[in-house]
């Protein structure tokens, strides 16, 4: 038992603990840009669905539906994993997770993006309610994401001030 406990309490080098705190914010800024790109792709899909004739043919050639699905899938996976990574790094560095608005809104963003992705089977069947709900949820996600960027910068500034 003592051997198992010593393995669980491996010492993490201080430099790793310090620099690991910056992984989450860097990834999140990339994901914010990715989310905006996913919105652009989604709007192009909607535009192609409503277009007619040559305009529709040109839009279909852009394969926006495939790109949107792929970008959305990567966004879902990386956003979810990165949220848990951030909590783990915070716990390793401070021995606790700070219960504040940044954590709560971050968990809401993860919950909303998972809910949005769960609408895919309904959207593939052409259900407009699912498409509209998907768009509405993701506009909300982008708004919360922007707010998270602001509070995240404040968190990073606090970390830097303590170095």
Regions picked out by a protein language model, each given a short descriptive name:
Residues 2-163:
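Membrane-embedded alpha-helical bundles that constitute the cytochrome b-like, heme-associated redox core
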